[in-house]
Amino acid sequence: MLAKRIIPCLDVKDGQVVKGVQFRNHEIVGDIVPLAKRYAEEGADELVFYDITASSDARVVDKSWVSRVAEVIDIPFCVAGGIKTIDDARRILEFGADKVSINSPALADPSLINRLSEKFGVQCIVIGIDSYFDKETGLYQVKQFTGNEKATLTTKWNTFDWIKEVQSRGAGEIVLNVMNQDGVRCGYDIDQLTQARAVCNVPLIASGGAGEMVHFAEVFKQADVDGALAASVFHKQIINIGELKAYLKTQQVEIRL
């Protein structure tokens, strides 16, 4: 069985790491490179960096920090933010990232997934999906341009249909960002992730809701995800990654110590 992955997420805005709640009211957490280094030293399996306003600002992720991160960490990392072309992706991979993640640009042009996976291989291509559960309609909806509250759109896609679509186009991995749970630290959305797992045949990463160690054990055991992504619990030092991994081992979760 493949080891489950613990993945700190660093949302980047104006060159600094920030964190919001339900994709709003972002506060500055700190500088990119020292945080990346700290998480690598604590035992993170990989890191994900989201330049959260790149797509809504119609620009590509700022590459200057990508190479600085590559110099100081020896674990895989993934970069997202406004990647719309093969050249955008190539530059980020050349700067040292192991994977690129696309979200809003894939919704605007789904064939981008095909082109990127054919050029770089599916192992490099991660699709981020921002999923919102509408309590009134009972529907799971995919949102676009979520880095900017004023620009955010509800797309035509049902979350689970979009999961199927991106896989058919060459997604090598899917990160499901559950917007309702983001930053509130009350646990992952096990129900939605279980439904996603049923239609997802590539690695599935849970994102949104981690608040305590038991939440990680629950999402691995109940939703059978391949990785758990979290931000605020690590940024605010509520949970230490080394201690989390030791705990998961006691819960019979396959993990790299």
From Swiss-Prot:
Catalysis performed (reactions): 5-[(5-phospho-1-deoxy-D-ribulos-1-ylimino)methylamino]-1-(5-phospho-beta-D-ribosyl)imidazole-4-carboxamide + L-glutamine = D-erythro-1-(imidazol-4-yl)glycerol 3-phosphate + 5-amino-1-(5-phospho-beta-D-ribosyl)imidazole-4-carboxamide + L-glutamate + H(+)
Alphabetized Gene3D superfamilies for the sequence: Aldolase class I
SUPFAM superfamilies assigned to the protein according to its UniProt record, in alphabetical order: Ribulose-phoshate binding barrel
UniProt pathway annotation: Amino-acid biosynthesis; L-histidine biosynthesis; L-histidine from 5-phospho-alpha-D-ribose 1-diphosphate: step 5/9
EC number: 4.3.2.10
Annotated Gene Ontology cellular component terms: cytoplasm
Keyword Transmembrane helix: no
UniProt keyword list: Amino-acid biosynthesis, Cytoplasm, Histidine biosynthesis, Lyase
The UniProt record lists the keyword Electron transport: no
GO molecular function per UniProt: imidazoleglycerol-phosphate synthase activity; lyase activity
Main location: cytoplasm
Active site (UniProt): 11, 130
Subcellular location: Cytoplasm
A UniProt-annotated Pfam family: His_biosynth
GO biological process: L-histidine biosynthetic process
Protein's job: IGPS catalyzes the conversion of PRFAR and glutamine to IGP, AICAR and glutamate. The HisF subunit catalyzes the cyclization activity that produces IGP and AICAR from PRFAR using the ammonia provided by the HisH subunit.
Quaternary structure (record): Heterodimer of HisH and HisF.
Recorded family membership: Belongs to the HisA/HisF family.
Designated name of the protein: Imidazole glycerol phosphate synthase subunit HisF
Organism of origin: Psychromonas ingrahamii (strain DSM 17664 / CCUG 51855 / 37)
Phylogenetic placement of the source organism: Bacteria, Pseudomonadati, Pseudomonadota, Gammaproteobacteria, Alteromonadales
